[in-house]
């Protein structure tokens, strides 16, 4: 049985304007995977995929899927968790197809999606880390959390913080909007 994404009415703080003359009309889907990591030679499996959909310069929808894989945190094993990323492809993939995908340091997200569906064309892609480096060369750090702190883009989502797929996807969306102004 297909499980819908957990949709959230996350209290996402308004994104400050960096440049009032900027074009904020670009629509995109910011995504973030959380993975089990490589531990003692085991596979690095995604256990959470968070997303934030942006339309006309505002986060209009957020959600997440959990994947029930070995080595994942307890919440990935809840009753509404999906199987593996590959076995639940038809549930989550339509949300990501045919849209501009935004991620921070896209190598991880792009690799996971390509591994799950090698013949699927994902993207076009936008990397917020590359955008930040281009707009603000010489910063002491280009980590997502550090950039969001520097630019006042840290989301406010009850019970969530960094290294949570939903939280990081919303943070990435906020940062993309800020950098795109």
Question: Where in this protein do the model-derived segments appear?
Answer:
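Conserved non-catalytic scaffold segment of RNase H-like nuclease domains
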Residues: 18-124, 138-141, 145-159, 163
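Conserved glycosyltransferase catalytic-site signature
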Residues: 110, 128, 165-169
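A charged, well-structured terminal subsegment
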Residues: 157-176
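Conserved beta-strand -> loop -> alpha-helix junction used to position metal-binding or nucleic-acid-contacting
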Residues: 121-133
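Active-site catalytic microenvironments for nucleophilic, acid-base chemistry
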Residues: 116, 134, 150, 175-181
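Acidic two-metal-ion nuclease catalytic site recognized across multiple nuclease folds
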Residues: 6, 16-20, 170-181
